[in-house]
Amino acid sequence: MIKKLKLTFIIIFFYLLLINVSNANLQEKIISKLQQVKTLSFNFTQKIAEKEEKGNCYIKYPLLMRCNYQNAKQKILISNGKTVAVIKKKYKKIYYYPIKITPLFTILNKEKILNLIKFSKPIKNGLKVIMFEFNDKQSNNLKIFFDKNSLEFKGWETKDAYSNNVIFTIIDLKTNKTIQDKFFKIPKEEDL
C-alpha cells in the first residue's frame, strides 16, 4: 500500500513538473513570436452582451489602433497613442477617452503583454487557445488569448464602461504589413 502511494506521488510530481516545463516552453515561444511583430491587420468579431459587431482592424505597436466597424452608424475606433476616439460618422460625433484608463492601454502595449506572458502562468491551456489574465490598477480585468498551434494573437475579453462582457475575436490575422502613422490620426468633428 505504501509503495503504491509513493509511486502515485512520484507520478503526480513528475506530471506537474512536465506541465510547468511545457508551459514555460510555450510561453517562451509566444514571447519570441510576439517580439517580432510590429503591426497587425485583421478582421474581427466583437461581442458585447448579446450584440455582435464585425469589421477590420489595424494595430501598430506601441499604442496605435484603428478599427472600422461594418454597421449602420459607420463607427470607427482610433487610438493615436494618447487618446481613444470612438467616431460615429453617421451622426458626425466623436467621443474621446484617455487611453490609460482603457484596457487598450495594455492590449496596444506590446511590452506589457510580453511581461504578462513572461511573469504569469496561463489561466487556460486548452486544445485551441492559451489564455493569460491581467488586472491593472484601474480594476480592468483583461484576458488575452493566443492560438495554441500558431501562437498568434487571437483576441481578448474584458468589460466595457457599463460592465458588459466584451469578447473581441481576431480573424485572418496578418502581421508586419507597412502602416503609416498618419493612418491613426483622429479627425476633427467638422471634417466628418
Language-model regions, residue ranges each:
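Flexible, surface-exposed loop/linker segments and immediately adjacent secondary-structure boundaries
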Residues: 90-129
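A short, Trp-centered hydrophobic/proline-enriched beta-strand micro-motif
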Residues: 32-52
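An acidic-aromatic
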Residues: 57-106, 166
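Gly/Pro-enriched, hydrophobic low-complexity segments
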Residues: 115-192
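Bacterial N-terminal signal peptides that target proteins for export
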Residues: 1-9
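Boundary at the C-terminal end of the N-terminal hydrophobic targeting segment
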Residues: 21-24
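Bacterial N-terminal signal peptides
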Residues: 10-18
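Solvent-exposed strand-loop boundary residues in beta-sheet-rich modules
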Residues: 48-50, 90-92, 162
